[in-house]
Regions:
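Short boundary/loop segments of OB/S1/cold-shock single-stranded nucleic-acid-binding domains
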Residues: 116-123
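Short beta-strands and strand-coil junctions in structured, solvent-facing domains, enriched
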Residues: 16, 37, 77, 97, ...
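Alpha-helical, heptad-rich or low-complexity scaffold/stalk segments
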Residues: 1-115
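Buried hydrophobic packing residues in well-ordered domains
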Residues: 30, 90, 127-130, 137, ...
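Extracytoplasmic
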Residues: 25, 122, 128-132, 147-151
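Structural recognition of beta-strand segments within beta-rich domains
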Residues: 134-135, 143-168
């Protein structure tokens, strides 16, 4: 992935569309909206940090994983909308209005409401072989227009529970 590809992916996840303008401005806006501070380092280091915080679950739950856990706990569904819309919808559902602040602070406040802690209680686990996970397509597929490399969005059709835990 190029720097612009990674940055655009994070922007689409957070805002719903890739932003335009100089990379430096786009990086600064994401950092400000996400944590409220600008980080030090090279452009690529900063983009990788934003990308990893959004998608990587290897050291801690990613923003997407946290949002999925919050939404499922609060409304028993997980939306395919952008993060900005998902946070807003949950705040209106919980508080009756939207809050101000960074994505991080808003997610922490929702987590305190849902779980009694700013930290969402998630643990990594291994899904046993042959575990059935039913999925439903989000987008209508047309075999005539479908080609290798196309993104096909899907969602869980049913909850997958293992040892009393919901698996994401």
């Amino acid at each position: 992935n190029t720097a612009d590809d990674k940055l655009a992916a994070v922007e689409v996840t957070l805002y719903g569309t890739a932003q335009t303008g100089p990379l430096a401005d786009r990086i600064s806006k994401l950092e400000k909206d996400f944590e409220g501070v600008h980080t030090e380092g090279s452009m690529m280091d900063r983009i990788n940090a934003l990308y990893d915080a959004t998608y990587d679950n290897s050291t801690s739950p990613s923003l997407i994983t946290q949002m999925n856990a919050l939404e499922w706990t609060i409304s028993h569904k997980v939306s395919m909308d952008c993060m900005q819309q998902r946070v807003t919808d949950m705040e209106i559902n919980v508080y009756g209005k939207t809050s101000t602040g960074t994505f991080k602070s808003r997610v922490e406040a929702l987590s305190e409401f849902a779980f009694g802690s700013k930290t969402i209680p998630l643990v990594q686990t291994t899904i046993p072989a042959n575990t059935l996970a039913k999925v439903a397509l989000v987008d209508r597929l047309n075999a005539k227009n479908l080609k290798k490399g196309d993104v096909v969005r899907f969602k869980a059709a049913e909850d997958v529970i293992e040892d009393g835990m919901l698996l994401f």
